[in-house]
């Protein structure tokens, strides 16, 4: 299928300005890397997502979904087919102690809404830079909390465009993982069950976690957060630091001097710079300590020709 035809058709389905050709994906990731998307669409509701999926299935066009791009490296060759950004699907409702949040809502914003309603349970998320969908996809967590602790169910869309409601058990949550890495479901919304709390206590905890994050993490540079999962009985950052790798740079990307678990884009780095540095760190740590660091960040897209 000719991508010009795909662009022209989807332009009749989505609002004006929500379909683009050859969109640079570095503009849609936190680390500011990534090549072009053949066709880039940003639906505003579930019906538009279904229309894109059905059209893509009809003509066998590959589809890639993006949240807010906080925990992903898109290769320099970009993404073929249709790239679907979910950043406009951002509704959040509160009923009693239940919050229902759509996939594109920032999990930080949801934690603040919980605070506004004196609800406790999402304080840990006050510094996580991902979307709700991304947070469920990887069972995001920090400071002793994680999404699986508060999620009760979620609405997903299958690869055929069918809506389903799944209970938490169906997610098969583990440490920084869920079943969604192995199926073709799209997370559309999540239902969180929280508890009534005291506003001042909730805010104090969030302020404390924010201070810890700002004092320890290199927020002054683009990054994708923690690059590696925590190995059993150890810390990725400590292993990297003890390997003497802080400040190690490949191209425009370096291991942060502030927190060794982060890799920061300090000088117009590329996706390949990130990938090469990740491999170098993994190889060095394994040689020194016999520990294989497992990536937490996702790598998608095509290599640059």
Curated annotation (Swiss-Prot):
It catalyses: UDP-N-acetyl-alpha-D-muramate + NADP(+) = UDP-N-acetyl-3-O-(1-carboxyvinyl)-alpha-D-glucosamine + NADPH + H(+). PROSITE patterns: FAD_PCMH. Pathway: Cell wall biogenesis; peptidoglycan biosynthesis. The active site is at residues 176, 226, 296. Its cofactor is FAD. GO terms for cellular component: cytosol. Its EC number is 1.3.1.98. It comes from the Bacteria. The keyword Magnesium does not apply. GO terms for biological process: cell division; cell wall organization; peptidoglycan biosynthetic process; regulation of cell shape. InterPro entries: FAD-bd_PCMH, FAD-bd_PCMH-like_sf, FAD-bd_PCMH_sub1, FAD-bd_PCMH_sub2, MurB, MurB_C, MurB_C_sf, Oxid_FAD_bind_N. Residues 33-197 form the FAD-binding PCMH-type domain. The keyword Cytoplasm applies. It is found in: Cytoplasm. GO terms for molecular function: FAD binding; UDP-N-acetylmuramate dehydrogenase activity. Keywords: Cell cycle, Cell division, Cell shape, Cell wall biogenesis/degradation, Cytoplasm, FAD, Flavoprotein, NADP, Oxidoreductase, Peptidoglycan synthesis. Transmembrane segments: none annotated. Cell wall formation. Belongs to the MurB family. This is UDP-N-acetylenolpyruvoylglucosamine reductase 2.
